[in-house]
Structure formats: structure tokens, C-alpha cells
Amino acid sequence: MSRLSAESVTLAYDGRVIAEDLSVAVPDNSFTVIVGPNACGKSTLLRALSRMLKPRAGSVLLDGAAIGSYPARKVARTLGLLPQSSVAPDGITVADLVARGRHPHQGLLRQWSPEDERIVQESMAATGVAALADRYVDELSGGQRQRVWIAMALAQRTPLLLLDEPTTFLDIQHQIEILDLCAELHENQGRTLVAVLHDLNHAARYATHLIAMRDGRVVAEGAPGDIVTAELVERVFGLRCQVIDDPQTGTPLVVPAARRAAARAAGSAAESAAESVAGSATGSSAAAARPAGPPSA
């Protein structure tokens, strides 16, 4: 089953077609990760799934109906989005930004309630930013800010959560913390997550469903253990590699071919061959130059 899907969509920016006749279905209750080389269309696909980009042709479906047919507030109650570059308003505190996640649930007949306050507090606690509630967002580190944005998305209480490169600009420690948090949301809260990631090894470790794209089309999709092979990596990324089991998780681990080592080995072999040829030539020259000995008796 799939609550969110794209059917034969054509996606374009500024008149340039990025993807054509593209179809994907996000499995319910999955942590789906979209991977592929730069400019392959993965972020474009995510924007279409989130209703940020209207397809030129085809349809994005939410619960069986075209996503564009729903009022924006209804979509915001069902689908949360963490864009690639989020900028907080000047002078806003962590608690105030997270509280904005409750806006889709407000209206003329429903104002801020104790339930909203409880959800905001729970969202900050779940992302580890409760102690930062009174801090200004622009004073925080990159990892802390990313957690705050995720807390705001959590406060929407949507069953679907889309994240566009949530680990961009973070160091390795904060990357793992954010991905661990996403895994917890999927495993413990039953949310369906869709994320765009650049790191294939991170994707293979955390995803339950992987979509590999190249040139605006889906090359392969399925469980990482079923589809991540050396052949797929070379086909999608143009990278020669070996795929082994991750010693920590047993998931596929991509080990790039040692190109520098191979180049050094080739260089050493060529140097040895050149020295051998030079040595042979020197020996021949010396023999030719050696004066003849006395005539034999």
C-alpha cells in the first residue's frame, strides 16, 4: 500500500525537463531514501511529492487523489516537509519556531490549546532540543538548528515526513545523530519518512526502501540488501567498487576501488620495466664497447 505516489509525472524547472514519465510509490510505514548523482532529479522528485512543484504532466497522489486537489491546510496536516535550506525568522526562539508546526491545526474555531503546548514540548524532547527552548535559533550550531527544524516538522504530527538532504553541511557526528533520530521516528512512532541523501552508505544503513535514480529516471528500487551491488553503483554513480557487509549492521557497505593505489602500482610497474629496459640497453652498449682480447694461441 502507498498513501503517497507519483504516476507518470513529467517534472521541469524553467522550461527544462528534469524527469519524464516517472512513477514511484512510497511504501507505507517505510523509511524511503532517494539516492543518485548530482542533478539526477532526486530533490526535484521530493519537491513534487511535497506539492512544492507542480508536474507538467502526470499526477502526484495523496490517499488516492491528486495532491493539488486538497486544501493546503489539509496537506500540511498529512505531510510534513523539511526543505534543503531552511531559514528561521530573525529573533525567533526555538520554542516559537517549533510551535509554528501547530499552525495547520489552528483556525477560527480552534486556537492554541494545552494539547498544542504538550505536542510542542514532546517534539522538542524527542529531538533533544528542550533545553534550548528559550535560545534564539540563529545562535545555535548547524546540528542543533537541524534538530529544531525536525522538531517543528514533528509538531505538525503528520504521518508522512519528507526531508531534503537533512544532513547537508553537518559534520559526521551530527549526520549520524540526525539519521538515528529519523530511524527512531520511523521505528518508534510508525511514521513514513522519505529523505534525499547523498551518502550511499548512510542510505543503505538506514533505509528500509531505497530508490536509485540517474538522469531523471528510477534505475532500481527495493530493500538496500537486495539492490545495492557493485554493478548498480557503477551504473548509477560511475564508480567502481566492492560491496561488503557493514560490520556493525550487516547492511551493504560500498568500498570504492583504490584508484590511487592502482595508479601507484601501475606507475611502479612502468618504472621497473623502464629500468629493466635501460639496464639491458646499458649492458649491450658496454659489451659492444669492450675491446677484443688477445688472439688465442
Locate predicted features.
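Catalytic Walker B motif of ABC-type/P-loop ATPase nucleotide-binding domains
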Residues: 161-165
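Conserved ABC ATPase signature
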Residues: 111, 136-140, 144
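Conserved ABC ATPase "signature" region
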Residues: 99, 114-132
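Conserved structural motif at the start of ABC-family nucleotide-binding domains
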Residues: 4, 18-21
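Conserved ABC transporter NBD signature motif
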Residues: 58-66, 75
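Helix-to-loop junction immediately C-terminal to a conserved catalytic motif
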Residues: 50
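ABC ATPase nucleotide-binding domains
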Residues: 237-297
